[in-house]
A protein has these predicted regions:
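Structured interaction patches on ligand/partner-binding surfaces of diverse proteins
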Residues: 64-86
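Short beta-strand/loop motifs in extracellular/secreted proteins, especially
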Residues: 25-29, 55-57
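Short, low-complexity N-terminal tether/leader segments at secretion or assembly junctions of large
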Residues: 1-16, 66
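Collagenous Gly-X-Y triple-helix signature in extracellular proteins
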Residues: 83-339
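A short, amphipathic beta-strand motif
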Residues: 16-25
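Short, acidic Ser/Thr/Gly-rich low-complexity loop/linker segments typical of extracellular
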Residues: 33-51
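A glycine-anchored, Pro-Gly-centered beta-turn/N-cap motif
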Residues: 45, 53-55, 78
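A short, solvent-exposed beta-strand micro-motif common in secreted/extracellular proteins
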Residues: 53-64
Length: 339
């Protein structure tokens, strides 16, 4: 994975073009172009390759089962520098910066699989009824370059699980769970029982999710990208196609069609701009449990309004089926984001 590269004055023998490779000591480093291969010499902490011809050289570093590559365009005499980093096929062994570098090149599926997990620690107030202190949980891949023609590229993650493998799917729940809240900061969609304004104007989007984001680790939030998502952003009780418009979001909730691959209560036009996430295409459970009581299944929110009702937003029922709830009810929270 390339972190930086550039040419500068100087050079070696022959052609006068050298590639300097910074990578873990003990690696084997080569450069290849067509039928030509050159081996690197380790010198003073870097690997040096003296290339005999101009062109695009593929630099490969290997160490054990790990491999890292970069393509260097050698166009003139001089020194070309590249830093390579090995990418672990165990998602959790990579830092967020490395995951972002893979996502930026749309190569996530080359290393990881849908459902792979990475641990995070949440610290801080996320609701008037929930403050988390060193709460360790796992986010998991729900798609690679999901719906990229509409939403752009990236690795999409969902929350949350209790363990790296075979973990229980959980949603954050505050002390107001399953009760209506008309003031303060809770895991409700709005402080009044209305879906007017849809997703874009919801209190969940404008106030709650930014608060949740502030409690996430900075090394994660620094690489979360803004993504284009489509939702019913009008609400009010009518199933009107023009109500479905785009917003730009970093943290967001999944929509009904993105979870179920079918429309039950949501605006029937949302599906024209959405795709079901690969995690759910694969048949994974849609049931989530309380983060603090993992034997208790919960209703968790979606961003879709119930199109033909002025009071309700869609969600996933305790048995994993499509359902809906009054907008002012505090319910389970499971965020999504893209890197």
């Amino acid at each position: 994975m390339i972190f930086n590269r550039y040419a500068r004055g100087g050079g070696g023998g022959g052609l006068g073009a050298l590639i300097y490779v910074t990578v873990e000591a003990g690696s084997t480093v080569t450069a290849t172009m067509g039928t030509m291969t050159r081996n690197a010499v380790y010198s003073q902490g870097v690997y040096v390759i003296d290339v005999p011809a101009f062109g695009d050289w593929v630099v490969t570093a290997t160490k054990g089962a790990n491999t890292a590559t970069a393509t260097i365009s050698v166009t003139k005499a001089g020194m070309y520098e590249v830093t390579l980093s090995y990418i672990s096929k165990t998602l959790n062994d990579n830092d967020w910066a490395t995951i972002k570098s893979v996502a930026d090149e749309s190569k996530g599926a080359n290393y990881w699989s849908v459902g792979d997990t990475k641990q995070i620690t949440i610290n801080g107030k996320v609701s008037d009824g929930l403050t988390l202190s060193n709460y360790q949980t796992w986010v998991y891949i729900i798609g690679f370059d999901h719906n990229s023609a509409v939403e752009g590229t990236g690795i999409a993650f969902g929350g949350f699980k209790t363990a790296q493998t075979s973990g229980i799917d959980v949603a954050l729940c505050d002390s107001g769970y399953n009760s209506n809240k008309t003031s303060g900061q809770w895991f409700n969609m709005n402080n009044s029982n209305t879906n007017a304004g849809g997703w874009s104007s919801s209190r969940m989007r404008s106030t709650t999710l930014p608060l949740v984001k502030s409690a996430l680790p900075s090394e994660l939030t620094s690489v979360i990208k803004t993504t284009t998502i489509y939702s019913d952003n009008t609400g009010g009780g009518s199933d009107v196609a023009s109500y479905v418009t785009a917003t730009q979001d970093d943290l967001y909730l999944l929509a009904e069609f993105e979870i179920f691959g079918a429309q039950t209560y949501a605006n029937s036009a949302e599906r024209n701009y959405q795709k079901q996430y690969a995690y759910y295409v694969a048949g994974n459970s849609k049931v989530k449990y309380r983060h603090d009581s993992t034997a208790t299944a919960v209703f968790w929110w979606e961003r879709s309004v119930y199109a033909t009702d002025a009071d309700l937003f869609c969600g996933v029922n305790t048995n994993g089926t499509a359902n809906n709830h009054g907008a002012h009810y505090s319910s389970g929270l499971a965020v999504a984001f893209k890197i």
